[in-house]
Amino acid sequence: MTELKKDVARIMQVVKGEGVKERVFSAKSSYYNWSKEERELKARVENIRERKLMTLIFDLEESLQRVPSQSEYLNEYMKIAFAKIKKEDWYTEIVKAFNQDFIKSCVTWRADRAYKSSLIEIMTAMQLESKGYTVFRHKYLDMVMGVDLVAVKDAKVWYIHITKDSTFSKDKVLEKGTYRDYWVNYKRFNYQRNFENHVELFYSADEGTNNVVKNGLPLFKFDYVMDALDEQHAFKYDDNNQM
């Protein structure tokens, strides 16, 4: 059994068991009910950039030799996020005393969203492989290129972004397209991302045109994925983009 098939089997165990949660939907209040201070704190949590958060799903897969459970993922995500938050100027003693629980909720919501997207990426990779594509999924594709999956077939390549079908999430993808540098061993490497003609796959928490939902996990419909990987979004697979 390939590693991808093992990952898919593990995800199916999660889906059949406790399922996949996105706890923002069960929050006692929503964005429209929050105070100005809470909205600002939510934005600050969302704007935290930490490499260890970006690679967490891959790092846990490597250390555990399997896809982590959602609780395992959240526990590690919370540790890393708060290690970063505690260094921020805005995390004052007053904020800590009066807004700690709200900040934890914001981190949880962000972690839930990231975990769900990671599982969808794995399941989509399996869908594509079943249709004869060679699929690449790696932390450096995401960190450097801002791409979730790369699919190759018949000397053509597609660069795939997978995100939630919401204005907030779509804006995050556009923001990723503006990144211009990356640090390795304290050395800065400059580059320019270009998402033009990339494939964008959008999922919803509810069943619809693009996906079904199995115990909290959206799964893309085959036709939606296949239609998206068309000639218009294909690049020639040559020496310039082989990995």
Identify the residue ranges that each predicted region occupies:
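Nuclease-adjacent, charged terminal/linker segments that flank catalytic cores
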Residues: 1-90
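Long, compositionally biased intrinsically disordered regions
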Residues: 2-19, 212-243
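Rossmann-like adenosine-cofactor binding region
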Residues: 100
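A short, highly charged nucleic-acid-interacting micro-segment common to nuclease
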Residues: 103-122, 142
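A short acidic/basic microdomain associated with nuclease active sites
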Residues: 121-144, 148, 152
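Active-site beta-strand-loop-beta-strand hairpin of nuclease catalytic cores
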Residues: 151-160
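Catalytic cores of nucleic-acid endonucleases
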Residues: 162-230
